[in-house]
Regions:
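Start-transfer (signal-anchor) and selected internal transmembrane alpha helices
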Residues: 1-37, 166-218, 514, 525-526, ...
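Membrane-interface helix-loop junctions at the exits of transmembrane helices
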Residues: 29-36, 212-223, 242-252, 285, ...
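Active-site-proximal, structured, solvent-exposed surfaces of multi-pass membrane proteins
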Residues: 195-197, 651-774
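Active-site lumenal/periplasmic loops and adjacent helix-entry segments of GT-C-fold
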Residues: 213-351, 358, 385, 392, ...
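Membrane-interface transmembrane helices that cradle and orient dolichyl/undecaprenyl
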Residues: 355-375
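Membrane-interface alpha helices of multi-pass inner-membrane proteins
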Residues: 375-390, 425-430
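Perimembrane helix-loop-helix junctions
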Residues: 396-429, 508-517
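Periplasmic/ER-lumenal interhelical loops and adjacent helix-loop junctions
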Residues: 420, 427-511, 630-650
Length: 774
């Protein structure tokens, strides 16, 4: 294909050259726009007005206390004019409450979506806000308002609004992305005119676009689907953005999480695909836009990868398309993505078809075929992707991989097969070493909440049998069906588009109508049906998880980590998608074109009455969640707090909270992310300690800024970073997080392995292509 495109000599076409010139002009304009966006607007407290507070000449600001009562708009500043751009709003204040007061900006002459702002809560010990506003049209009548909560005191001292070049960065990014898209469409149209693209391929392309569009329907409303895990994952996105801004790559500890104490979520929970959303947020997009684009990209990746894998397995593009549709629009995937906001499992869904396809090749292809030696590629990408996206799904997949290898044990020990499987393990581990080494290091070295939940039972969180075979699902909130029944239940099933093909396949076997299937497809169908059925059974309330859990200490840890048995539906979904493909092949081989049309029409109808029905309920019965900037949701939410050092009282983690022994004096204190600079001296006769507003994780170091002398760092009260200051010491201390050398070495190994494997596969492909041409 690439040679045919070269033969078209696009560079000689006048229209294409004009298109490139236009794109170049836009690129130049975008680059120029990056400069000169650094205006700063200052407003002192004299320009503000207050309906209840008194002005303090001594502290140069408006002072409010409990005698004022709770007042909305207690302090105001109007008449703010800002040109189009993205700004950081810094209100300088003092308060003794936590999230009791609020600062916001509003447009007094509002126009739809021309001014985006959520504001920020005010915190004791912080002293300045840091929220963003998006001014998408020149504004002349903006206002700042400060709401007083009625408790404690509040002193409002001044305002600073700093412009950034974020809009220009967004424009440049959109120009680059738009240019690539337009050029691709142009080449496609010209290719069609020159060579005439096969109608079947056009149908497939249109079908894939439609599936992506339908999978993204909930994104086509104003707002995000509010759900249990959404805030947690939005915090992860914000953490990646903050880490990138502060030069931390890859992200290990989110610097702003937990009131600036930091949270090591990224060490335990892979962020690989989530870096897409983090990069978009860092680029300047609002949090909601970054979320939407990320979900759209994940939907696209799921559709395309599933299509590639299933059409390769079943050797038919239409079967691949319909399997991709059934898998992407499966009830469990849609519910997890939109109802639960489970980004980790949504990312895991991207890679599962690669693992299924990889094992299909390993156990069905001719081992003498030259291509057999490359069967490790989809398996390696799939397993590495799972490990770096969602370890729990990796745990489930590992269990079923063991079962599959036991079932196929004779083939496993063939020399070439064993080599392929060994390569999969080795390359998956090496390419994931950058994530696995810190993870294992902390699990062995530390003591975290996640290591102390082995007694948590999961069986009572199982699903009812009726849920597995339900047809119509509604968006609900109830996830505990053992005593609440199915009233207001969350969608926890596989959907009729997956269980009906299973019923048909069982009927084919029962009535011995298997002539329409090859022995290979029949065996694949049997294994997929068995594994899918087993996975469904493991989600039920009746499955004896409690007995299994307490068999040993290992089973305790593994079972409790699952949290919800319905996680096995992710395995059931991909297995039953394979069954659906087998049934389609049977129908096509039995009835020809009529069988294909019947299957396509039937699958579309089933998806409409199940998944699209669920999406409709989600869109119309859930209020939109508009979050432009993460500052408005605070930084303290950590879901179950699994990655906190065990025993930490998160409610005591307050901004700027310093504790130090008697005899120690501190001056010139400053904190940026995970780095603290301070000048101190110890006048005492003994070594003293300073407890800093950083949560203790292995990797923090403290040293003298001049001599480089290292100070002892240890876990202090409430698991915060504590530094030992020797008696008589006087100087400047620098404290910060630093990845150990072996973490960095693991990162280098992963990069080299991925690059090496990529180059090796590319060279091998080129050699094969050269051989075919010769």
């Amino acid at each position: 294909m690439w040679q045919k495109i070269k033969d078209m000599h696009m560079e000689k076409k006048r229209s294409f050259r004009m298109l490139l010139i236009m794109e170049l002009c836009l690129l130049v304009a975008g680059v120029i726009g990056l400069f000169g966006k650094d205006d700063v607007y200052y407003f002192d407290s004299h320009e503000m007005v207050s309906s209840v507070g008194g002005y303090s000449q001594e502290k140069e600001g408006y002072f409010l206390d409990e005698s004022c009562g709770a007042v909305s708009g207690a302090v105001k500043l109007g008449g703010i004019s800002l040109p189009r751009g993205v700004y950081t709003v810094s209100l300088y204040y003092e308060t003794d409450t936590f999230m009791g007061n609020m600062c916001n900006m509003t447009d007094l002459a509002p126009q739809y979506k021309t001014f985006l702002c959520n504001g920020e809560h005010l915190y004791e010990g912080l002293g300045v806000t840091d929220f963003q506003v998006w001014v998408l049209k020149d504004k002349e009548n903006l206002a700042l308002t400060v709401d007083y909560g009625g408790t404690g005191y509040l002193l409002v001292q001044g305002l600073e609004i700093a412009q950034s070049n974020a809009l220009s960065r967004i424009f440049l990014f959109c120009v680059i992305l738009g240019a690539l898209s337009v050029n691709a469409c142009y080449v496609y149209v010209m290719y069609d005119k020159t060579y005439v693209i096969d109608r079947k391929d056009k149908n497939i392309l249109a079908g894939l676009v439609l599936v992506i569009a339908f999978a993204s329907l909930p994104l086509m409303v104003d707002g995000m689907q509010s759900n249990a895990d959404l805030v947690f994952h939005l915090m992860r996105v914000a953490g990646i953005k903050d880490g990138l801004q502060m030069g931390q790559f890859p992200l290990r500890i989110a610097p702003e999480w937990q009131q600036g104490y930091g949270y090591a979520c990224s060490i335990f929970y892979g962020d690989t695909l989530l870096y897409i959303a983090g990069f978009l947020r860092w680029l300047g997009f609002s949090l909601i836009t970054s979320y939407r684009l990320f979900v759209l990209i994940v939907n696209g990746m799921t559709v395309l990868i599933a299509y590639y894998c299933f059409q390769k397995m079943f050797r038919d593009k239409y079967v691949g398309l319909m399997c991709s549709a059934v898998y992407t629009l499966s009830i469990y995937r849609v519910a997890k993505l939109y109802v639960n906001g489970a980004f980790g499992e949504a990312c895991a869904n991207v890679f599962l078809p690669l693992i299924v396809y990889g094992f299909y090749r390993v156990f069905t292809e001719d081992i003498e075929d030259k291509k057999y030696g490359r069967a490790w590629i989809p398996l390696t990408i799939g397993f590495a992707g799972l490990v770096q996206s969602h370890l729990l799904t990796g745990e489930l997949t590992g269990l079923f991989t063991i079962l599959l290898c036991l079932a196929m044990w004779k083939k496993v020990f063939r020399a070439r097969t064993f080599t392929v499987l060994a390569k999969t393990v080795i390359y998956s581990v090496l390419s994931s070493l950058w994530f696995l080494v810190p993870f294992v290091d902390y699990m062995l070295r530390g003591d975290f909440v996640i290591q102390n939940v082995a007694e948590r039972e999961i069986q009572y969180r199982g699903v009812q049998l009726a849920q597995l075979f339900s047809v119509f699902f509604n968006r609900g909130n109830n996830v505990f069906y053992y005593n609440n029944g199915l009233s207001d239940a969350q969608p926890s099933g596989i959907g009729i588009a997956l269980w009906l093909p299973l019923v048909v396949f069982v009927g084919i076997l029962y009535f011995r109508k298997t002539k329409g299937l090859s022995s290979k497809d029949l065996k694949v169908g049997k294994i997929a049906a068995a594994f899918g059925g087993l996975a469904m059974c493991m989600t039920l309330l009746a499955f004896p998880w409690d007995k299994i859990q307490f068999l040993s200490s290992i089973s305790k840890t593994l079972v409790s980590s699952l949290q919800f048995p319905n996680r096995f539906l992710i395995i059931a979904s991909v297995c039953l998608t394979v069954v659906c493909g087998v049934v389609m092949k049977w129908a096509m081989n039995t009835w020809g074109q009529k069988g294909l049309v019947t299957c396509v029409a039937g699958i579309v109808a089933l998806l409409l009455v199940s998944t699209v029905y669920l999406m409709n309920d989600m869109v119309y019965n859930n209020s939109g969640y508009l979050v432009y900037d993460e500052e408005c949701i605070g930084s303290g939410y950590v879901a179950g707090g699994e990655y906190l050092p065990y025993g930490t009282d998160a409610s005591q983690l307050m901004y700027g909270k310093l504790n130090y022994d008697e005899g120690i004096e501190i001056a010139d204190y400053s904190k940026t992310g995970l780095n603290i600079d301070l000048t101190c001296r110890n006048l005492g006769q003994q070594d003293g300690r300073i407890e800093l507003p950083l949560l203790y994780y292995w990797g923090y170091k403290a040293q003298d800024a001049v001599t480089g002398e290292e100070m002892q760092v240890f876990k202090g009260t409430n698991n915060v970073v504590s530094v030992v200051v020797p008696s008589g010491y006087e100087g400047q201390l620098k404290v910060g997080f630093e990845s150990p050398w072996y973490w960095r070495m693991a990162e280098l190994v992963s990069v080299l392995v991925v690059l090496g494997l990529g180059v090796s596969v590319y060279i091998q492909k080129r050699k094969e292509m050269s051989g075919h041409e010769a």
